[in-house]
Amino acid sequence: MSSNSSCLVTNQGGALPLTATCLEGFYCPNNSLENPPEICPPTPQCRLTRLQEYHNICDHAQGTYEPIVCQPGFYCPSGGKRQIPCPKGHFCPLGTVEPFKCFGLSSCAEGSEREIPLAGLLCSILLDIFLVIVVSWPFPFAWIRQLSRGKLRRGAGGNDSESGVISAGRREISFSESKYHVSQFFTSDGSHGTAAGIEVEFSGISMRPTRSGIETLCLQNGVIRAGSFVGVMGPSGSGKSTLVKVLTGRAQPTTGSVLINGDTCRAAELRDLLALVPQDDIILPDLTVQENILYSSRVRIGSSRKDSEIEQYVDHLIISLGLNKVRNRLIGEVGKRGLSGGERKRVNIALELAAVPGIIVLDEPTSGLDAMTALSVIELLKSLTKQGVIVICVIHQPRLEIFAALDDLLLLNHGRQVYFGSAAAAKQCFQDAGYTFPLNSNPTDTMMDIMSCHDNLHLTDYPRNKPALPKQNLRIVLQSVKKIRAPWYCQVLLAFMRGTKQQTRQYPSFVLEILTGAGCGILIGLSNYEFKGHLFQGLFHLPFQLLSSPVSYRLLTEQGMLLCLTIGCAAGPAGVKTFGEEKLVFLRESCSGYSEGAYFLGKALSTLIRIFLSALHFTSFYLILTTPIVSFPNQLIVNLLYFYCIYGAASMISAITSPKNGPLITMLTSVLFCALSGCAPRLASVKSWNLAWLWYICPAVWIAEANFNQYTDPLAYLYDIKPAAEDAIRAWDRLSLHSLFIV
């Protein structure tokens, strides 16, 4: 340094004097009114440092009177006369005026330039331990209870059979007694959905799909009276399933109509009145037999009976269907041990009987059942008809005992009505038409053979023996049925409790989801580790702009895009499972009168626990490695909101795509969101294309802007933030709006 210059380098034009005093965030120990701040040419070593993309701030001033930004690990109070080491419990990044207080449980030693937040990691560990205890704790106690129950039964001289159940303080309940209690629960006053006096009439029903143009169903007029047990038979492709869909409101006939008590009934009203047991066993696999049946009963008759009465009824229903031994067993699914095919069929029937319907339609309820079990199911259904319930049963060549239980018989062939009348008179009707039946043969087998050989067969209908009962007004019946259902808010609570219980049973996928969130947080954190929390560098405020090193605006926008990408990877596939695996269950429940809104809200609320835990693990590891200036709560809120967005998008995708394609489409959607985050192409370019509206309907833009604000707001005293915001066309002063738009 020469005697007449204060700069380290004197051969490049000397100092450029400044007219301002020391700005906040700078260290100016030698400046005064007589010696104002000045800018000196950099030394070769400092010049090389300033040419670096990152870590480009020189450690020392280039002259006696040149200000230097306050170094990391120190803070410089207003005036810039002192550079003080950062105290313990605080951290001081580049240009600190007042030390930033560390969040609770963070690692901040004396002289820290960044905060290492450990609160999230500690919360994650504690919550993980708690969840492990919750999931594993019931098992030893369940084993003890099972052992005690076994000793009690052996001591009482009983056994664990399907014919009875033992509970504390109660005697053994027999199969026949349970069947009696079930039939008595179907009261004849209509207050529980039975609505005695209901009469079903179909008039000129036909179905001709527009695509094929082939008539699949063509019926003459028919009436089904209250208390009738009607069997529907016919060869494959005869229109039995089509008839079931029309009668239950699942399909709209091309011509004709279905009448209830003489009034035309719309499809939605039919779904309210009738209970359908589909041929496929559509049941939630992660719940037990009792839990599935109880849920159905609580939703559909929750307003008419006390919960204790519903539980007692479900107990009797389980025993009467021979499910007592498996009442606490999970339903299971393909490749996962659960119930047998016959047991699943009986649970399928119990789900609809739990609603105490006035009309129940069953599509092949005896398929997959052994002879004795099939007969017991038919006997239970027969007992319900004595309470005025209409039972319509699609059966395929039943045994003699089952055929004898039928009151009426409807025979279909190629969609046309062959016979509709008394089941007992059907054989005689065929014989009167000139057909013979072999001795000691099952008449249903012979009838099926005859229809298979004669496509245009039509027999005279024989009158039914069931007398007409006094009819109730259809509107009164509909009101009584809707009145007994659980209120909407109760259905939300029930759906939430069911969804939460499912989460506890899906712990392998639950653990994988949390580990994925933690892994994604580690990956993005490692990509930022070398920056030591210094993710943004802008131009210093005037007149110190010439002291600025190259700016790094793009790093922060890239950070927002990476956040969107990694959160999409962590939350997308998991979000598909929320609704995608239950689509068929939802459709069945929706057609049975369950509130669709209550289901979606309750299910969504039950997933908030998973969303929070995934976001917590992601944020904890991300912040430990990235160590940004952003506080742990603020970063957690932003990440949590984007997790919620991805879950919502994945849920909508799963509702309109197949389970096979859902995860792939969700990942592609997440990548699309990242592309529309405003990083590349920049929002400045997008605005020139007049396509900014497309970017702003994407949640990734809003999380990127929220991330931008969280990093730049605390440094606004040091850097001129406006040029950085204009470079990316970011709204740097509306953080509160970002959270709203993300949601």
Swiss-Prot record:
<dbReference type="Pfam" id="PF00005">
    <property type="entry name" value="ABC_tran"/>
</dbReference>
<feature type="glycosylation site" description="N-linked (GlcNAc...) asparagine">
    <location>
        <position position="30"/>
    </location>
</feature>
<dbReference type="InterPro" id="IPR003439">
    <property type="entry name" value="ABC_transporter-like_ATP-bd"/>
</dbReference>
<feature type="glycosylation site" description="N-linked (GlcNAc...) asparagine">
    <location>
        <position position="159"/>
    </location>
</feature>
<feature type="transmembrane region" description="Helical">
    <location>
        <begin position="636"/>
        <end position="656"/>
    </location>
</feature>
<dbReference type="GO" id="GO:0005524">
    <property type="term" value="F:ATP binding"/>
</dbReference>
<dbReference type="Pfam" id="PF19055">
    <property type="entry name" value="ABC2_membrane_7"/>
</dbReference>
<dbReference type="InterPro" id="IPR043926">
    <property type="entry name" value="ABCG_dom"/>
</dbReference>
<comment type="similarity">
    <text>Belongs to the ABC transporter superfamily. ABCG family.</text>
</comment>
<keyword id="KW-0547">Nucleotide-binding</keyword>
<comment type="function">
    <text>ABC-type transporter; part of the cla gene cluster that produces clavatol and ortho-quinone methide. The clavatol biosynthesis cluster cla and the terrestric acid cluster tra are both involved in the production of peniphenones and penilactones.</text>
</comment>
<feature type="glycosylation site" description="N-linked (GlcNAc...) asparagine">
    <location>
        <position position="4"/>
    </location>
</feature>
<feature type="transmembrane region" description="Helical">
    <location>
        <begin position="507"/>
        <end position="527"/>
    </location>
</feature>
<keyword id="KW-0812">Transmembrane</keyword>
<dbReference type="GO" id="GO:0016020">
    <property type="term" value="C:membrane"/>
</dbReference>
<protein>
    <recommendedName>
        <fullName>ABC-type transporter claG</fullName>
    </recommendedName>
</protein>
<keyword id="KW-1133">Transmembrane helix</keyword>
<dbReference type="GO" id="GO:0016887">
    <property type="term" value="F:ATP hydrolysis activity"/>
</dbReference>
<keyword id="KW-0067">ATP-binding</keyword>
<dbReference type="GO" id="GO:0140359">
    <property type="term" value="F:ABC-type transporter activity"/>
</dbReference>
<keyword id="KW-0325">Glycoprotein</keyword>
<dbReference type="InterPro" id="IPR050352">
    <property type="entry name" value="ABCG_transporters"/>
</dbReference>
<feature type="binding site">
    <location>
        <begin position="234"/>
        <end position="241"/>
    </location>
    <ligand>
        <name>ATP</name>
    </ligand>
</feature>
<feature type="transmembrane region" description="Helical">
    <location>
        <begin position="611"/>
        <end position="631"/>
    </location>
</feature>
<feature type="domain" description="ABC transporter">
    <location>
        <begin position="200"/>
        <end position="439"/>
    </location>
</feature>
<keyword id="KW-0813">Transport</keyword>
<dbReference type="InterPro" id="IPR027417">
    <property type="entry name" value="P-loop_NTPase"/>
</dbReference>
<feature type="transmembrane region" description="Helical">
    <location>
        <begin position="560"/>
        <end position="580"/>
    </location>
</feature>
<feature type="transmembrane region" description="Helical">
    <location>
        <begin position="661"/>
        <end position="681"/>
    </location>
</feature>
<keyword id="KW-0472">Membrane</keyword>
<dbReference type="InterPro" id="IPR017871">
    <property type="entry name" value="ABC_transporter-like_CS"/>
</dbReference>
<feature type="transmembrane region" description="Helical">
    <location>
        <begin position="124"/>
        <end position="144"/>
    </location>
</feature>
<dbReference type="InterPro" id="IPR003593">
    <property type="entry name" value="AAA+_ATPase"/>
</dbReference>
